């Protein structure tokens, strides 16, 4: 088999290493690749004790992608069990249905333990899940021991080692339960995180919302400004209200244009000046001085006009 594959491929190296590690069967699981296909494995797992699957021995396929271990495998059960559909890719956090929860550090052994740990759990409508009654599952568990795989030739009666009652067996059961719990918890966390990120990504706002917020802040910062200053500032903030399109439906060019328009709005001199409070007394003082100067100039012009008129009359009489 080694001569048929590129030994420099990370997937080939990883699968050959795992095949060597799983070569010897245990009392709970066993898995090996087919003789003519390194990327398809057949596995056998024992049903978890103290459950509806106690006493059952279940067989299935693991189809691995060329990108393994960066992408998860697909898992297909071949033995009727009452928990997973036969001949269909099942939906687990470690399977190809959930690449977002898969970790490259997980292995085929991880998948086998997860299958054992997930068997007593509820399907909850997942793809490939079944919810048979406990009686039906126990009957299928007994029937599973007579199954023989045509693809690899494995017989369920002798493919696994006899079940032990020692600490190794209980440790494997506990490890499977703990692994299933951790994977399930990780899937829930990732699912909630994905919901949050999608809601943030799909959230859109319009410039109207921005206009509603800016005057409030501006009025709080310039409570002592005159009414005319507030009106001019409010007028400088007024912009046409056009809703901003969602990021997911805009082209890169449209997103860049949107970002540039937002930057121009935020760096506008009117906006910058609007956030800088002015001294009301300084404005009134300057206006008063200007009024006085204009009044004095007007009075000087009037007096000069009167003076010139009187001087002309005096010269005329002489």
Swiss-Prot record:
Keywords of this entry: ATP-binding, Endoplasmic reticulum, Membrane, Nucleotide-binding, Phosphoprotein, Transferase, Transmembrane, Transmembrane helix, Ubl conjugation, Ubl conjugation pathway
Residues exposed to the Lumenal side: 304-318
Residues in the signal sequence: none
Induction conditions: By Dengue virus infection.
Subcellular location: Endoplasmic reticulum membrane
TM region positions: 283-303
Active site: 91
Single Gene Ontology MF annotation: ubiquitin conjugating enzyme activity
Membrane topology, Cytoplasmic segments: 1-282
Family: Belongs to the ubiquitin-conjugating enzyme family.
This protein's name: Ubiquitin-conjugating enzyme E2 J1
High-level lineage: Eukaryota, Metazoa, Chordata, Craniata, Vertebrata
């Amino acid at each position: 088999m080694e001569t048929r594959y590129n030994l420099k491929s990370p997937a080939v190296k990883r699968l050959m290493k795992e095949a060597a590690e799983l070569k010897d069967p245990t009392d709970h699981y066993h898995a090996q690749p087919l003789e003519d296909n390194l990327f398809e494995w057949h596995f056998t797992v024992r049903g978890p004790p103290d459950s509806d699957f106690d006493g059952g021995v279940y067989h299935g396929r693991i189809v691995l992608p060329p990108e393994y271990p960066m992408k998860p495998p697909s898992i297909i059960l071949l033995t009727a069990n009452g928990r997973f559909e036969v001949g269909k890719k099942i939906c687990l956090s470690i399977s190809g249905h959930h690449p977002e929860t898969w970790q490259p550090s997980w292995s085929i052994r991880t998948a086998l333990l997860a299958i054992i740990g997930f068997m007593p759990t509820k399907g909850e409508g997942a793809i490939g899940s079944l919810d048979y009654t406990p009686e039906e599952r126990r009957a299928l568990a007994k029937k599973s021991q007579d199954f023989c795989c045509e693809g690899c030739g494995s017989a369920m009666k002798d493919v696994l080692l006899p079940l032990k009652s020692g600490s190794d067996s209980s440790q494997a059961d506990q490890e499977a339960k703990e692994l299933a719990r951790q994977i399930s918890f990780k899937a829930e966390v990732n699912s909630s995180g994905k919901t949050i990120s999608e809601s943030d990504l799909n959230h859109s706002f319009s410039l109207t919302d921005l206009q509603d917020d800016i005057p409030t802040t501006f009025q709080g910062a310039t409570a002592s400004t005159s009414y005319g200053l507030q009106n001019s500032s409010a007028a400088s903030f007024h912009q046409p209200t056009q809703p901003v399109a969602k990021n997911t439906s805009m082209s890169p060019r449209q997103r860049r244009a949107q970002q540039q328009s937002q930057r121009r709005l935020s760096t506008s001199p009117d906006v910058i000046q609007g956030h800088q409070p002015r001294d009301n007394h300084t404005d009134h003082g300057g206006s008063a001085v200007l009024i006085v100067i204009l009044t004095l100039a007007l009075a000087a012009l009037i007096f000069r006009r009167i003076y010139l008129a009187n001087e002309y009359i005096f010269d005329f009489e002489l």
